[in-house]
Amino acid sequence: MEESATVEVVVGRVGRAHGLRGDVVVEVRTDEPDARFGVGATVQIEGSRRDLTVVRSRWAKGCLIVAFDEVKDRQGAEELRGSVLVVDVEPNDDPDDPDEFWDRRLRGLTVVDESGKSRGAVKDVLHMPAQDVLVIDVSGEEHLVPFVHQLVPTVDVASGRIVVSGIPGLLDSNAEEAR
């Protein structure tokens, strides 16, 4: 039986150095920071496939501070600044909660209205303070749709589609036409 290929997923970006021992501040880009940056976890630098093994991590003033076994001093930490950190995951690995979705599984899904008419595709997911927002490409125009059940009643990853409520102007090319 053929093994399934893995998918590279961004989990963080290295910010500034913290202290003299090689610790770095990580801008978290994952819903599972404690698992992805727990002691013993391994991440890679995007593009280089260089492994970094977490030896310490802690939260301080809302920032994740991480020490990697391969980085011994501040100079090594400074060299990592700006590096994007990735992990390999199974492509069909989904959250346990049926109402949660990984961004990578939503990108590219076809967006249809309640009548089934194709309206565009999910381009990205923005994580805002109030709620997540879908960026939907409609004929080359980006439309922002709050990712809430009232506006997005159905998400069917298996069939590759999302249903968006038919609110006038929400996905219209020219919002003025909806008035």
Swiss-Prot record:
Record localization: Cytoplasm
Keywords in alphabetical order, please: Chaperone, Cytoplasm, Ribosome biogenesis, rRNA processing
Question: What main location does UniProt list?
Answer: cytoplasm
Q: Which GO terms describe its molecular function?
A: ribosome binding
Pfam families from the UniProt entry: PRC_RimM, RimM
Mind listing the GO biological process terms from this record? ribosomal small subunit biogenesis; rRNA processing
Which domain of life does the UniProt lineage start with?
A: Bacteria
Q: Where in the numbering of this chain does the PRC barrel domain appear?
A: 98-170
One GO location term (cellular component): ribosome
Q: Quaternary structure?
A: Binds ribosomal protein uS19.
Its function, per the record, reads: An accessory protein needed during the final step in the assembly of 30S ribosomal subunit, possibly for assembly of the head region. Essential for efficient processing of 16S rRNA. May be needed both before and after RbfA during the maturation of 16S rRNA. It has affinity for free ribosomal 30S subunits but not for 70S ribosomes.
Q: Which family does it belong to?
A: Belongs to the RimM family.
Known PANTHER family for this protein?
Answer: RIBOSOME MATURATION FACTOR RIMM
Question: Domain notes, please?
Answer: The PRC barrel domain binds ribosomal protein uS19.
Report the protein name in the record.
Ribosome maturation factor RimM
Its source organism is: Cutibacterium acnes (strain DSM 16379 / KPA171202)
